[in-house]
Amino acid sequence: MTITASLVKELRQRTSAGMMDCKQALTETNGDMEAAIDLMRTSGAAKATRKAGRITIEGLVKVNISADKKTVTILEVNSETDFVTKGDVFIGFVDMLGTLALKTTPINIEEFLSQTLDNGDSLEKAREDIIAKVGENIAIRRVQTITTNNGVIGTYKHGERIAVVTVLEGGDEVLAKDIAMHIAASKPECISEAELSTDLLEREKAIFVKQAKESEKPDNFIEKIIVGRMKKFVNEITLYGQYFVKDPDTTIGKLVQSNNAQVKSFVRFEVGEGIEKKEENFADEVMAQIQGANTD
């Protein structure tokens, strides 16, 4: 049977799979549309296995909050390219995961990945189906549940790549959201100096001492230099020490104090942070794509 362009188009519309994958499935099933769909679903797991080694550095973050605003889940799902992240298939998958996370409130990614969907499929099976549809490796990278009984929760998303959740004691939702926005922009490592390790502070101080002594300035002046640099270092990496992005004349520490509030915790997710992207030259990249098309 001749595999027409209209058959390939129909199969693509029904499966969201690539053109060559659709044509191959129709060829193997002699143009039987339903058999081709079954074949593509069956081969999905095998394709997912082959794609599993590919680096996923693009993606989306998703935040879901309960009706009573006492529970929030935040998750990151990755793909290989930003092209896939803009597609309805991937966006729908991430939306489904966000709903599932809020429903199950997992304590870690391992617990989340062990969940079963309403249709009886495992989450891994659902992931493999998405991989078969979009033709890229998909990774459900991380998830976190944040709960509070009496605190105030604030959330902020910068586009689809950065998401922040803050929990305040005192204050209100406007303040909580403002602080979440600040965290998105300024990336503090912790709330206050009390959370910094002694090892980190001593290591930084040793560096500053060495630099100051190399300046050959008087000892009393060197001490002032070290104190000043340590204070600047601490302020730059702690939330309370940072200057508020909406009002550079005040620090976050002073802001929460003036509102009779405290920051109890925060979570910041940024797509791809900590993932090393493999460097490839253009020729290697083209060859890899050709080889990938041949094996898929």
Curated annotation (Swiss-Prot):
Pfam (any one): EF_TS
GO molecular function terms noted in the UniProt entry: translation elongation factor activity
Localisation per UniProt entry: Cytoplasm
HAMAP family the UniProt entry points to: EF_Ts
NCBIfam families: tsf (TIGR00116)
Function: Associates with the EF-Tu.GDP complex and induces the exchange of GDP to GTP. It remains bound to the aminoacyl-tRNA.EF-Tu.GTP complex up to the GTP hydrolysis stage on the ribosome.
Protein name: Elongation factor Ts
Species annotation: Ruthia magnifica subsp. Calyptogena magnifica
Gene: tsf
